[in-house]
Amino acid sequence: LVELDVDALITGFKDLLLSLEQDRKLAGKFAGILHITNDSIADVVQSDRTELLYGQEYFYEELLGLKFKISTFSFFQTNSYSAEVLYQTARDYVGDLGGSDKTVFDLYSGTGTIAQLMAPAAGKVIGVEIVEEAVEAAKKNAAANGLDNCEFIAGDVLKVLDEVEEK
């Protein structure tokens, strides 16, 4: 099942967005259509207002056997096929870390994708991310994937590392 998510960062055109779901070739493939309003000058995706026009505010993506719930403002690789190659290469490079005495750190972890993909090779994985919503998503995704050796901490990486016991 291929799910599509349309996040339009525009100032109008809601009718056009809704017409996408009515297109016969695309009908039934959208997890959600959101209208994101941002009238400020910015080089990042930010929202002055987000309106759900259709469906839900998230979609699911599967990478290397793990399933991730992705929302509009989650950090997630946009090219999933390339991400799988990259992450598989990283897993192959790391290999088996020798069991329960090894800890992997995923710094600036976002929604914890890399941490979760490394979890089977390590005794423990610690992800650190400053965006609290991303940390909550990482915790939920890890639980949904049955990974009990992942810990995600919300905070500034430089400050959190001073406080972490596993170094």
Task: Pin down the residues of each PLM region.
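Accessory RNA-recognition modules of RNA-modification enzymes
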Residues: 1-167
